[in-house]
Amino acid sequence: MIFLMREFVMVEVTKINGVKVLINPDLLELVEETPDTVLTFTTGRKIIVKESRQEVKNLVKSYRKDIFAN
């Protein structure tokens, strides 16, 4: 799911503990499946999410389409 938040868009993912969080995909540097999906940001922060690598990829692609369509 994609949200408009104060002039920028964020993507919703679910942390491994079930908590839904919004991430800025522009800061996403690396998506790994180890087998858990680990998101690494340009800040060095990492989070483990329930979504698969492919699901994260699709969310980011959808985000980019929305950004460039407007």
Show where each model-derived region lies.
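Eukaryotic intrinsically disordered, low-complexity regulatory linkers and tails enriched in Ser/Thr/Pro
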Residues: 1-22, 26-70
